[in-house]
Amino acid sequence: MPPLNTVLRTLLPIVSTALFYALFYLISSLQFDVAIKPAAIPFDYLLQLIVAYVLFALSRRLWVFVLLQGLLTGVLYVGNAVKISFFGGPIMPDDVYALRSLLLVLEGWHFIAAAAPLAAIAALLLFNFTLRHWSAYLASTIVILTGITLVYEPGAILQPLDRHFGNSVWDQRSNYLYRGATLYTLQEGARYFADAHTPPDRDLALSAAANLLENAMGNTTSAGNFTPRNVHIVLLESFWDPTLLEEAGYDRDPLAPAFRALWKQAGYSHAMSPVFGGYTANAEFEVLCGFPVVEDNVKFERQLLNDAPCLPHLLAENGYRTLASHPNVPVFWNRINAYRRMGFQTYWSKQDFLRDDMNREFLSDASLYRQVLEKIADPVDRGQPLFNYIVTYFGHWNYPLNDARPNRITASSSVDEVSSYANTMYYKSAELMTFLENLQARDPDAIIVLFGDHLPFMGENYSAYVESGVLASKRSDFSADMYRFYVSTPVIIIDGTRGPLKTGDLA
C-alpha cells in the first residue's frame, strides 16, 4: 500500500484544479457575465485536469506547482472573460501577435496587471522544471506529441472535436461558452494551424499580376491634363455620435455644432468599419488599400509582409509626397513596417511630436493637428503634391481628460463610459473643426476625408448600447440592423471648395 503522503500528493492536482476552476468560473460569471455552460464543464475540467497532471509531473516543488497552475488557469479563464466583455469575443491564436502592442499601450497598474502574470508564469516554469521521475518523461512526451500533432496534423485534433462539439464561424463567444476555455483553446489552436495559408508560387503570382495589369492598362483611357490635388485623410479614434444612445440622458449634444452642421451637409454619411472597440489597424488597411479584412486578426501584424499597391504607393508613384502621423510608439500594430510597405515615405510617430498637451498618456488632437500643420507647411506652400494621413491618439478608453478640458456634458446613464465618452467627443469634434478651418485656409482645394475607425467601448457586454436598445448583450443575438449599427461610424469627404459630398454609407 502506498504511503499516505504519496496518495495525497497524487490527489493534489484534482483538488487544486477543482478549486481554481470554481474560483475563476465565479469571477468570470459574476464580474464579467461570462458563464461557461454547465454541459461544457465536465469535459473542459477533464482537459484542465490533464494539463494539471502534466504540469505536476514536471514540477520540482508542490507550492510552486499550485501557484503556477493558479496563474495559468486565471490567465486562461479570466483573460478570456475580459476580452469577451470588452470586444465581444474570446482570445484567438492570432492575439499572440498583438500581445506586444497591448503591452506597449498599457501604462501604470494596467501594464502591471497584464505583464506581471505572464512574467511570473515564465519565471516559475523555468524555476520549477524537473525531469527527475519517470512521470516527468511521460508528461514531456505528451506535450511534444500534442505539439507535433497540433502543428503538422491539426485535422487529427480538429475534425473529431468539430464533429462532437460543433463550431460556429460567426459566433466565437458561443463557441467559448459551449466548450469552456481549455477545450476552446485546443480547438481553435488546431484550427489556426489547419487554416494556415500556403503562399502562392512567386513566379505564378508575378505572371498573374502582369497579365492583370496588361489587361487593365489596355482598357484605360488617358486622363488628359491632370492637376494633382493634396489629399488629407484623418482617422478619428473611436469617433461616433453619442446621441444615438437615446437612454443616455445627455443634457446637451456632445458633438460640436459646427461638426454637426458639416456632417448634415454630407447627408450624415457613414463608413462601415471591420472592427469594434479596437483593432484600428484593420480599419486603416481597408481605407488605405481597398481590400476587406476577412480574418479575425490584426492585418498589420503578420499578414502584410511585402510591398502592396495601396493608395500611398500609387500616389507616390505619381509624384506625391506621402506622410503618416500617429503620436504613439512606432512599433504599435507593427505600423513602422506596415506603413512603409503600403507606400508611406515618412512616418512621424511619438518621438516626432512635442508632448505638450496630454490627456494622461494621449496627446491631444489639438496639439497633434497643430504640429502636423507646422510640418506640412513647407510642401503645401511649395505646391508639392501631398498625401497627408493622420491617425489621432486621443479618444482611447477610458476617455481621460486633463485639467484644461473640464467636463461639459452630463448623463443620467449608470454606465460610467457614457458620460466620459461624451465629454471626450465634445473636445474631439471641436478641435477637429478648428483644425479643418486652419487646413482649408492654407489648402482650400484639397480633398479631405474624416472618419471614425470604430464604435467606442461603452461598458462590459455592450452595456450602454443595451441600455438604449440599439444592441443586444451578445453578438449571437444581433439583428441585421444591429450589425449595421455595430459597424457604422461618421464619414465626411470634402471636395475642396465644392464642399462635402453626400456619399451615403461606404463599406
At which residue positions do the language-model features occur?
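Transmembrane and membrane-interface helices of multi-pass
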Residues: 1-175
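Short, well-ordered coil↔helix boundary/capping segments
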Residues: 65, 69, 93-96, 182-183, ...
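A diffuse structural propensity rather than consistent per-protein peaks
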Residues: 85-92, 200-202, 310, 349, ...
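Secondary-structure junction/capping motif
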Residues: 92, 160-188, 241, 280, ...
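Alpha-helix initiation and N-capping motif
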Residues: 96-99, 179, 183-186, 206, ...
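Membrane-interface transmembrane-helix boundary segments in multi-pass integral membrane proteins
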Residues: 103-117, 178, 182-185, 417-425
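Membrane-interface segments at or immediately adjacent to transmembrane helices
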Residues: 152-233
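Solvent-exposed soluble domains appended to multi-pass membrane proteins
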Residues: 214-222, 226, 233-236, 241-507
